[in-house]
Amino acid sequence: MAQEIRAIVRIGDTDLDGNKTVAYALAKIRGIGIATAYAICRKLGIDPHATLGLLPEDQINKLDWAVRNLHELAPAWFLNRRKDPETGRDLHLIGSELVLAAKRDVDLMKKLKSWKGIRHSLGLKVRGQRTVTTGRFGATAGVTKKKAAPGGK
């Protein structure tokens, strides 16, 4: 009997394509890149080149647990939110948690009126890029060409 392939697998509150390999399917989760996906597979002993939809339910549950609790499996330097300002713990955020944490960080900078916060609130570049010629907004000032004189050379 041929094994059924699941078209959609839910891991980390994200619907993943069951036809892709495990590593590349995991990389579709926001906050999990390809290197992190391979590290998770290596840590759990799952073949990263296996098709995700063919994995048994217990391995999918292991993957879901590992994605949600990566801070327990990986060293601190591998995580995407070290020394969280609110809790002081090393975390690895995924999905909407990652987006909301970044938004909260920017809002905090704006509230504290730090240099970066002021630049964010003004809609200017934040990381030291040049702004003389690039990053302009508003209508472009076009150059109009003079009308040619009639009968001229």
Swiss-Prot record:
Question: What is one term from the GO cellular component aspect held by the record?
Answer: small ribosomal subunit
Q: Which Pfam families match?
A: Ribosomal_S13
UniProt GO MF annotations: rRNA binding; structural constituent of ribosome
Any GO BP: translation
- Answer whether the UniProt record assigns the keyword Repeat to this protein: no
Q: Which HAMAP family match?
A: Ribosomal_uS13
Q: How does it assemble?
A: Part of the 30S ribosomal subunit. Forms a loose heterodimer with protein S19. Forms two bridges to the 50S subunit in the 70S ribosome.
Name the protein family.
Belongs to the universal ribosomal protein uS13 family.
For this entry, the protein name equals: Small ribosomal subunit protein uS13
Q: Cite the source lineage.
A: Archaea, Thermoproteota, Thermoprotei, Thermoproteales, Thermoproteaceae
Designated gene of the protein: rps13
